[in-house]
Amino acid sequence: MKIKDHKIEDIAFLESPNFNDRPDPNNISLIVIHSISLPSRNYNNDNVESFFLNNLDISKNEYFKEISDLKVSSHLYIKRRGQIIQFVPFDKRAWHAGISNYKGTKDCNDFSIGIELEGCDDDIYAVSYTHLTLPTKA
């Protein structure tokens, strides 16, 4: 994998509106990994992509009404079968870590790359974890 203009080449890039400038775009020192599925434990759909693009169809699930006003994104989303989708260029601040603190430094979004794995906390991630190593080597 190669990065050009803060985007991984040869993967899908869907630009989320949910990002802004980093205080220092050269200070990226943390990778934050989360899991997500919408609805929970429901995989292989486009609900997460729609959520990050502010296009979630709230008629699909009652839970979607509760989260429809949230504005979130991640830099990368790795689906269960290994597909990697980028939503925010790496030099920009994705909105993935919320109110956060890492080793005494607050606002992790300022200095981190956010990666979402399609899944739940208690699921197996074999393929996703294999593909997780690819962008970290780029």
Please describe what each predicted stretch is.
Residues 130-136:
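Conserved small/polar residues in nucleotide/adenosyl-binding loops
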Residues 2-23, 30, 35-129:
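Active-site-adjacent loop/helix surface patches within enzyme catalytic domains
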